[in-house]
């Protein structure tokens, strides 16, 4: 069982087979699979606890409805792992509160019908035969809260959401990798063989393998080893409403594909987000500021295809609204970077474009299979060098 070790509870080990930088969900999953593969693995995290940056502001959703074939396959594998998570981490009865109430994508544009058909055809071809293409009448019959403006919908009952911190701690407890908090990486040392050591404010760890799982800060950490990663970060905000009264508790995650706005029930509350098209890429941020104009804007956009949100907006009180913000980290084709860098022994697991929760299980399994040689480098679709060589993957259309 992995432990979380703060500076007052113990010193850093002097060596490890693998050092993972970052203890968000991607770092925790990377360490879990590495330790399960028999590699002596430790995680270093500069904050006081695991999961305090992007993971802490996650919408906690999981889905296998994507447009890019490699993403579809990865997210399908992840969701399968999450459905049997207690068995995966070997913690009998461990509960991540997986709610499979589905994902419903909607459009009011009749001309988007062929695009929806194309995406569903691709998903069916890759084995997701349960994904449904719904005409307007069927959408309204099954989801009566949807406006008559809707033209077509896509639905997958298997998608849903979970408790991300339970998932994070499940990976930590189920693995054999300790997490050293308040540990800042200041250098990655190299020799003629590649990675040699990780230098931190708490000491130096000798290692021949380093995994960068630092979310928005991944490019900055890679630069310590002289590696350029073309990572971009943009702000994304979410609103949680403590009281709403009219949001159907059995509703799926609903996505307005025209605007990018989404919402879902959240126990007795609700969560809304998306639709931010104008934010420009920025440097990675420890604290991402919020905009108090955002709740009104997102509620207005949500009401476009789900009119009940207009009544919620009319009588909402300030103390019922909670805003948080994080950063989506992505590269040009909106697909993750998983695998080795030009420096031998230096690996990266990042750029999930705000969807690290759902990508972390399968993406981290792939990463460790690349480290151990179970998967050949040439069989990895998410390699960093695809970006430099211009061999980008088909751009992922379904980022929200």
Please tell me what each predicted stretch does.
Residues 59-142, 260-262:
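Dinucleotide-binding Rossmann-like beta1-alpha1 core, especially the glycine-rich loop
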Residues 155-208:
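Helical element adjacent to the flavin cofactor pocket in flavoenzyme catalytic cores
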Residues 304-400:
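C-terminal catalytic lobe of FAD-dependent flavoproteins
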Residues 243-344:
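Active-site lid/adjacent beta-loop-alpha segment flanking the redox-cofactor pocket in flavoenzymes
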Residues 1-18, 36-37, 397:
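Extreme N-terminal leader/targeting segments of oxidoreductases
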Residues 16-42:
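N-terminal Rossmann-like FAD-binding beta1-loop-alpha1 element of flavoenzymes
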Residues 51, 204-250:
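Central helical "cap/lid" subdomain
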Residues 36-55:
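Glycine-rich FAD pyrophosphate-binding loop
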